[in-house]
Amino acid sequence: MIKEYKIKSLILRQKFKDHKKFKKQILNYWKEGSDEPFKIKDDYYNDKLEKSDWPLANNWDRPWIKYAAPSIHQHLKLFAQHLGYRDIKLHKLWYQQYGKQDLHNWHIHDGSYSGVYYIELDKKSPTTEFLYADNPKKSFTIEVEEGDMVFFPCYIMHRSATNQSKKRKSIISWNTDFNNIQKQYLDNRPKIDRLKK
């Protein structure tokens, strides 16, 4: 029999600084790009996106990446430091645009933490939906608005449900790992809690 031990795992949210200016520039880059609709339908996936550059997620030479990656990294570094780490390493960075009826079904990511930056988000568009780790038959969402970044553990099952809005939804997503623990925690000798059998 598998014994469960509940531990706290955090999901973080923060506004992206200068979102309006950043949004305008990013959308121009994507409009000028040659990315195409993204569709997967098999025994596992049934995803449909208006546009995405996911197949190029580890290519750091894309024009929008050269513009966006430094600012995104700075925001992600703040999340990492909030969790007790010194810095963060971006492995993959990509965008997704959802038209009406588009969907990115249940999935997970590789790495330590992933997340979503909501570039365009209508009030009728779905936000990221998560499954509880201790009860995957129940889901939850977080109250967010356009311009928010949400940072969450890669292992949490999540999706973007079908977009019912007539307005497009646009996001940036990433896969990351942490670099080094902050010194204050290395020298710390906390009281140890023993989890019962």
Residue spans for each PLM region:
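A hydrophobic alpha-helix/topogenic segment detector
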Residues: 43, 163-166
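Aromatic-enriched
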Residues: 193-197
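Catalytic core of non-heme Fe(II) oxygenases with the double-stranded beta-helix
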Residues: 87-161, 168-171, 175-189
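Non-heme Fe(II)/2-oxoglutarate
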Residues: 1-85, 103
